[in-house]
């Protein structure tokens, strides 16, 4: 059995509605403490300015968080036109101010240039690393270092409204897309400059928006549990989504109970009628209990890649 760690062995995913002004790591630690979880990890940082969906993986769900990092995201963003900042958002210093002299046709053309497959040069104020150090550390020292343009895809970019100097957009994009950079680049295309004043992540993969929960709501449940004299987990755990929702889009392969011990020890097993080049979601027996992900190896066997560790006293 795996080595015990401090905290509760609780597995699942909390769809946190991160508040503005809080780092993603701080939000993660708050959720971990509330659930008294032994392990926790988030699935893609949001800027402190940003709000919205931050899936927090607890326990064994952390093994599958990478697949949510790789998932598409959706954002609602409001930009202030006419001002450019050094961070491309309202947390930074204004570096230029220019009047708004563009037409609706020019705006439409500029927006269209971001749709589809493009290359994006990441902002210096990002967590990407150069020679082992995050770019934002160089930026804070007034240094600029080389950054390679990275391929991104904007599946949808919808114009919502333009009120005065504030432009609101809805953007559905691939992993690794920096919304701040899109807004900064848009401002330069329009000749007026722009920066983000509101950013909200409304979707990660296919997770339902209505299942998001705030830190305040979680803490209120803790207080309610104390008042009612019940275990906090009785009120908190129903908010968790199953850990296999992180890999819900993977093809399922179901294995019989008889071969489960062999597979769960890390050995490849033979399965009938499966010939996929992609990762597979492995379920066990008639109950279809999720046990991990695997892939078909060169010998045509199902080889486990990441397996769930189950505890006898798992809550």
Curated annotation (Swiss-Prot):
GO biological process: mRNA pseudouridine synthesis; tRNA pseudouridine synthesis
Reaction(s) the record says it catalyses: uridine(55) in tRNA = pseudouridine(55) in tRNA
Cited InterPro entries: PsdUridine_synth_cat_dom_sf, PsdUridine_synth_N, PUA-like_sf, PUA_sf, tRNA_psdUridine_synth_TruB, tRNA_sdUridine_synth_fam1_C, TruB_C
Enzyme active site: 47
Keyword line: Isomerase, tRNA processing
Molecular-function GO term, any one: tRNA pseudouridine(55) synthase activity
EC assignment: 5.4.99.25
NCBIfam families: TruB (TIGR00431)
Function of the protein: Responsible for synthesis of pseudouridine from uracil-55 in the psi GC loop of transfer RNAs.
HAMAP family documented for this protein: TruB_bact
PANTHER family linked: PSEUDOURIDYLATE SYNTHASE TRUB1, TRNA-PSEUDOURIDINE SYNTHASE
Family: Belongs to the pseudouridine synthase TruB family. Type 1 subfamily.
Record protein name field: tRNA pseudouridine synthase B
Species of the source: Shewanella amazonensis (strain ATCC BAA-1098 / SB2B)
Gene this protein is translated from: truB
């Amino acid at each position: 059995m795996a080595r015990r760690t401090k905290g509760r062995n609780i597995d699942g995913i909390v769809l946190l509605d991160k508040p503005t002004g809080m780092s993603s790591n701080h939000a993660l630690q708050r959720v971990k403490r509330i659930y008294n979880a032994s392990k926790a990890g988030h699935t893609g940082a949001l800027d402190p300015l940003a709000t919205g969906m931050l899936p927090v993986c607890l326990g064994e769900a952390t093994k599958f968080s990478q697949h949510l990092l790789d998932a598409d995201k959706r954002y609602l963003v409001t930009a202030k036109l006419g001002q450019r900042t050094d961070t491309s958002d309202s947390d930074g210093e204004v570096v230029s101010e220019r009047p708004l002299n563009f037409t609706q046709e020019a705006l439409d053309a500029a927006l269209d240039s971001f749709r589809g497959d493009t290359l994006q040069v990441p902002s210096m104020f990002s967590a990407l690393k150069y020679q082992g150090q995050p770019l934002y550390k160089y930026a804070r020292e007034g240094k600029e270092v080389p950054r390679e343009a990275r391929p991104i895809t904007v599946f949808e970019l919808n114009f919502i409204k333009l009120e005065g100097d504030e432009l609101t957009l809805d953007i559905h994009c691939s992993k690794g897309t920096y919304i701040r950079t899109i807004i900064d680049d848009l401002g330069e295309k329009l000749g007026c400059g722009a920066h983000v004043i509101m950013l909200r992540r409304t979707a990660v993969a296919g997770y339902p928006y209505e299942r998001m929960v705030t830190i305040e709501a979680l803490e209120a449940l803790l207080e309610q549990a104390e008042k009612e004299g019940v275990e906090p987990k009785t009120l908190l755990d129903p908010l968790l989504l199953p850990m296999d929702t992180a890999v819900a889009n993977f093809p399922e392969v179901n294995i019989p109970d008889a071969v489960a011990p062999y597979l769960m020890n890390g050995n490849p097993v033979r399965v009938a009628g499966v010939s996929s080049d992609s990762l597979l979601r492995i379920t066990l027996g008639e109950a279809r209990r999720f046990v991990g992900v695997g892939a078909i190896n060169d010998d045509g066997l199902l080889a486990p890649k990441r397996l769930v560790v189950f505890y006898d006293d798992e809550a």
